[in-house]
Amino acid sequence: MLTAKSFHLICAPARCIELVEGIKTRRAELGQSLEEPLFIWEPVPDLCVPAELDNTIKALEHVDIISPNHAELSDIFSVVGNTESGDVDGQVIEDCSSKLLSGLSASRASKVSVVVRSGKDGCYVASASKKAWLPAFHAPTPDKVVDPTGGGNGFLGGLAIGLVRTGDVVEASKWGNVAASFMIEQVGVPVLQTEGGKERWNGVVVEERMKEYSMRCETEGSR
């Protein structure tokens, strides 16, 4: 585990810094030539409050990605993240993401991204060079959503794999949305089967769903 290419941290800001520094120190002690790992931080909901904003910015200096959901992000700035109709307020999410990034030091400003998980509204990705809304995979077929439990963790697992493979946060977020789509199609975990030498999750080959979703993003564009 210590030689992993990515780490998903779910913790308070101070604990995030402690974990990142500890992991880096222990990796150095291995005496191996290892690439710098990716750190994806999911802040705990009860500390997504204005009083923790400064600590959140400090923790951002140590990670590659921060990924709150839309409610947690808006809570950090004590603003309402939903419209009166209940939809995610895209402008609020974009503004809050920009505020987080603006607090970074010059040396880290180009290396950190905010990825906001927004349920049925997909996700918002923001970095110094890229900003994009990506739709939820099941947005056209909401009846396929059975239980959202595990969707966030599935998303971040897919995001981590996508980042390691592509190095592009927007492309990686597509992987996240596709991974989440499998997690929410049933109560419990998706069903894995192997047919013709190919893995199928809930009867679907992941690469085929990824291709379908990427084409949809290209034709429909972002929000």
Where are these predicted regions, by residue range?
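Conserved phosphate-binding/catalytic loop of the ribokinase/pfkB sugar-kinase fold
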Residues: 1-16
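A broadly conserved amphipathic alpha-helix scaffold signal in soluble, globular proteins
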Residues: 5, 21-25
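Glycine- and other small-residue-rich loops at beta-strand/loop junctions that grip anionic moieties
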Residues: 9-10, 45, 148
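Alpha-helix N-cap/helix-start capping motif
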Residues: 13, 70-71, 153
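Short, charged/polar "capping" segments at the starts of alpha-helices
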Residues: 14-19, 47-51
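Conserved phosphate/ATP/ADP-binding segment of small-molecule kinases
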Residues: 24-38, 43-133
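Conserved post-catalytic alpha-helical subdomain immediately downstream of the catalytic base
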Residues: 110, 139-223
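Glycine/charged-rich beta-loop-alpha catalytic/anionic-binding loops adjacent to active sites
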Residues: 130-142
